[in-house]
Design a protein with these regions (language model features):
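Short, cysteine/histidine-rich loop/knuckle motifs that typically chelate Zn2+
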Residues: 1-4, 21, 231
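Conserved, non-catalytic sequence blocks in retroelement Pol enzymes and Pol-derived host proteins
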Residues: 8-10, 127-128, 160-168
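Short linker/helix segments within small regulatory modules
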Residues: 10-17
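Generic recognition of stable, solvent-exposed alpha-helical segments in well-folded globular domains
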Residues: 14, 48, 110, 114-117, ...
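Domain-level detector for long, ordered catalytic/regulatory cores in large eukaryotic signaling
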Residues: 15, 25-95, 99, 172, ...
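Acidic, metal-ligating active-site segments
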Residues: 92-96, 102, 108-161
Length: 275
């Protein structure tokens, strides 16, 4: 990867010898000159999800935990039949119509596995610049009380800093390419509880992040841009005078006259995709 965390040299950047953003050399020039070997200056780490999931099925105790979704699904369908299409309470994502519809139409099968991906940056030390970016896998097959616990979270990638990645897609490429292959071909699982082998397909059910993380993943302008949410609503922000920051305020500020931001007050009930 680039020493300034710009890109990972994978996919379309695989054959490059220098960063396309900052032009820093990819390989250690000293080693290359004296040993004729291509030694990367910096590396990042991708942990494939497939082997991690296979390991969870190799012990009867963890195998039992991985059966939560199937049990919950049966419970939800019993409630739907009893309550004329309604569930008793919406206490998990498996009560959602998005999930139920995919089960009904056969897209999601009993032996498949649903996952959530989440990406975020972390400052490792308080007194120095030391950003590190990671993405994790949350296994939705587990109970809600278990799936978010540290011991059940699976690492996906670790991107060393100190700077923020500029082409985050390049760092996600290897892990998601592996994930895509498992979606197409299936993942062979040994169920130690039932002592059987089966093929499971993976589903990326949710992709989550905080504000900066979502901005990095989506490549959009972010909440401080002029049109912070250009996909769902066209609400324009008001620029803070003398800065490049915009704020999505509904009421026009008093004594405010900034070019391009002089639109009238906006009724919150009028905000929609056709605004």
């Amino acid at each position: 990867m680039c020493v300034n965390s710009c890109v990972a040299f994978v996919g379309p950047f695989l054959e490059l010898d220098a960063c396309p953003e900052c032009d820093e050399p990819r390989f250690n020039v000293h080693h290359q000159t004296h040993t004729n070997k291509h030694i990367p200056r910096v590396v990042f780490h991708t942990i494939p999800i497939g082997p991690q999931l296979q390991a969870l099925w190799r012990h009867p105790e963890s195998t039992e935990k991985m059966c939560y979704r199937v049990k919950k699904m049966q419970e939800v369908f019993d409630q739907l039949l009893k309550n004329d299409g309604l569930v008793d309470s919406y206490d998990d994502i498996f009560c959602s119509s998005a999930y139920i519809n995919r089960v009904v139409d056969g897209t999601i099968q009993l032996e498949d596995m649903l996952l959530m991906i989440s990406i975020d940056g972390a400052q490792l030390f308080k007194s120095k610049e030391s950003d590190c970016w990671i993405y994790i896998w949350v296994i939705l097959e587990l109970l809600p009380d278990h799936r978010y616990k540290k011991k059940h979270i699976l690492p996906g990638v670790i991107i060393p800093g100190p700077k923020k990645p500029k082409f985050i897609e390049s760092f996600l490429f290897l892990g998601l390419h592996h994930f895509s292959a498992l979606q197409c071909e299936g993942l062979t699982i040994w169920d130690s509880g039932c002592r059987r082998e089966f093929i499971s397909r993976l589903f990326l059910f949710l992709a989550c992040a905080d504000g900066p993380g979502l901005l990095t993943m989506s490549s959009l302008v972010g909440h401080q841009g002029k049109v912070g949410c250009c996909m769902q609503c066209p609400l324009k922000g008001c620029q803070k005078p003398g800065t490049s920051q915009y704020y999505p305020v509904l009421l026009k500020p008093n004594n405010y006259d900034v070019s391009g931001c002089t639109h009238a007050d906006i009724n919150v009930y009028s905000i929609n995709s056709s605004m």
